[in-house]
């Protein structure tokens, strides 16, 4: 079973939409708001013990992602995003709608990834805002190009597939509770 507990500091409990899939080994603590269709995969840690974390509709938080923030700050992840395996989001931070944060990438400390942007695998975005539809790469991350107006990242389109996959896993664990032990 996932660890879903209130903040020991504030007593605030996670608010998780009933359609969300939370993997049995995920951990969600405190002031966390998870919207419809979100899927939080195995080993992910979302720690809102002294901050607020919002995760928008149909966003995928993949295996071993860590999301946290400085005290009394906000992490705001939009709808239809994919936060790739082993990524770290440390706030205050904003990931706008339709973004893809690549495998092992970091968006930290006053960063803002603009709508429809891609933070490449392994990149580190620190204290920087990017405009919409940016390809952001490197350490420290820099904008390499702008995607055309109206373009949608393939990864962002895939958020719907991850939402469907989350539904299937949710059904599997509900039908077979012994799998969660």
Task: Please annotate each region the language model reported.
Residues 2-40:
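N-terminal segments that cap or nucleate solenoid repeat domains
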């Amino acid at each position: 079973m996932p660890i879903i507990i209130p903040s020991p500091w504030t007593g605030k409990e996670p608010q998780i939409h009933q359609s969300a899939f939370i993997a049995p080994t995920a951990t969600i603590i405190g002031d966390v708001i998870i919207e419809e269709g979100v899927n939080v995969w195995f080993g992910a840690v979302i720690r809102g013990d002294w901050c607020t974390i919002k995760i928008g509709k149909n966003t995928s938080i993949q295996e071993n992602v860590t999301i946290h923030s400085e005290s009394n700050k906000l992490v705001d992840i939009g709808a239809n995003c994919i936060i790739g395996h082993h990524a770290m989001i440390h706030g205050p931070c904003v990931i706008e709608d339709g973004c893809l944060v690549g495998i092992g990438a970091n968006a930290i400390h006053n960063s803002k990834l603009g709508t429809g942007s891609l933070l490449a695998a392994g990149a580190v975005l620190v204290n920087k805002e990017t405009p919409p539809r940016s390809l952001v790469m490197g350490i420290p991350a820099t904008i390499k190009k702008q995607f055309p107006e109206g373009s949608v990242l393939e990864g962002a389109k895939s958020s719907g597939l991850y939402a469907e996959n989350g539904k299937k896993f949710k059904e599997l664990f509900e039908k077979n509770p012994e799998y969660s032990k």
